[in-house]
Curated annotation (Swiss-Prot):
The modification N-acetylserine is found at residue 2. It is found in: Cytoplasm; Nucleus. The 26S proteasome consists of a 20S proteasome core and two 19S regulatory subunits. The 20S proteasome core is a barrel-shaped complex made of 28 subunits that are arranged in four stacked rings. The two outer rings are each formed by seven alpha subunits, and the two inner rings are formed by seven beta subunits. The proteolytic activity is exerted by three beta-subunits PSMB5, PSMB6 and PSMB7. Interacts with AURKB. Interacts with CDKN1A. Interacts with MDM2 and RB1. Interacts with the C-terminus of TBXA2R isoform 2. Interacts with DNAJB2. The gene is PSMA3. The modification N6-acetyllysine is found at residues 57, 206, 230. The lineage of its organism: Eukaryota, Metazoa, Chordata, Craniata, Vertebrata. InterPro entries: Ntn_hydrolases_N, Proteasome_alpha, Proteasome_alpha-type, Proteasome_asu_N, Proteasome_sua/b. GO terms for cellular component: cytoplasm; cytosol; extracellular exosome; nucleoplasm; nucleus; proteasome complex; proteasome core complex; proteasome core complex, alpha-subunit complex. This is Proteasome subunit alpha type-3. Component of the 20S core proteasome complex involved in the proteolytic degradation of most intracellular proteins. This complex plays numerous essential roles within the cell by associating with different regulatory particles. Associated with two 19S regulatory particles, forms the 26S proteasome and thus participates in the ATP-dependent degradation of ubiquitinated proteins. GO terms for biological process: proteasome-mediated ubiquitin-dependent protein catabolic process.
Amino acid sequence: MSSIGTGYDLSASTFSPDGRVFQVEYAMKAVENSSTAIGIRCKDGVVFGVEKLVLSKLYEEGSNKRLFNVDRHVGMAVAGLLADARSLADIAREEASNFRSNFGYNIPLKHLADRVAMYVHAYTLYSAVRPFGCSFMLGSYSVNDGAQLYMIDPSGVSYGYWGCAIGKARQAAKTEIEKLQMKEMTCRDIVKEVAKIIYIVHDEVKDKAFELELSWVGELTNGRHEIVPKDIREEAEKYAKESLKEEDESDDDNM
């Protein structure tokens, strides 16, 4: 009975006999059904890429963004329920703002990730609330700390990464990320690879239309989190499409 959650999935404050919290697992399932987001840390910064599915032709281009500015030096990429993610982005902004007001300098990313993770975890403890149905990545760059990348999931656990993927195609994306020599690459190199990975893992059968969102923070941007300029994004998309075409042609030749 406990393996299917009967009776034990009505509250986030209830454990099943085998030690599972089903409400948190359901929140993670919401993330797994979402479009893919990836973050890669390199020697001079962090690059985010998001596969933003276009569910209607009537949507205005650029709406419902999944990349957020948390602070001048911190960016955020999300997968899962967008409304939940926006709420957590506001919490992260408030934490960053309060830290600067109190101490007079930018909040360290590890501290910010821990603070927001504690907030997310608090929503897994009480029957009166539900867990957040989103996972998100935080990335920053500073001269002292270098590039940093953290991921926080609906259970409230925070992990540090060199490369991370969340969303429906996370396994395929992680496989592609593992092939990269991230520690030797720059943001300029990584942004092309991020675009390529998003195009590789995109499911054209189920999800035909999507927009590629790219942002970065690093030495190139003087430590500020910014959307990747249009010309560089288009160049990265061109590289991704050409790489896919070459791979398809090589597969045909092998057959």
